[in-house]
Amino acid sequence: MIARAPGAGLVMLAIAAACVPMWWIFGTPQLVVALAVALLVGAAIAAVGAWRRWSKALLATMGVVALALLAVPLTAPQRIPRGEWLPAFADASAALVLAWRRLLTIGLPVGTGDSLLMAPIVLVLAGTIVAVTLALRSRRAEAAALVPALLAIWAILWGPADLPAPWLTGLLTIVPITAYVTVVRQARRRSRAPRA
């Protein structure tokens, strides 16, 4: 697992880069905090899962528990001091289903109202758990590169039609993905090479 850690780091970098276009969707600093926390928590769950050899079901359960614990602090932190945990949790839970449609019908940037940050939090948390788990445990670790690619596609499709510097956004995502695939393939070749 330790030998695969640099590759997992590159996948996390690629996921972070794929999230850059989400800024133009939400336009709030709260997005940066929410996605950073989702990325780090997802990576921690995947790393502990690889270390302890958790099953897919246990990994998924831990992801759901993390999402439930983080939903209010990440989507509606302003409601915590007022003691509105239960209504905020209900809004965040409803946003699991409703945020996707609302993102398509509200003018950009959408901000943080109605727990709309739940959509990217779910994508980044689940995507990080899947990608880092694949990077650390799978025989076909290259498959982890699909996660940041899909996140970038989602961000571009849901984002504005006139995304600033789209070539830079693509480059930010492609470079770490390419580096990751290269590292994985070189490690595989070294492991198959005859020992002298």
Enumerate the predicted regions with their spans.
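Helix-boundary/low-complexity linker signature
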Residues: M1-A196
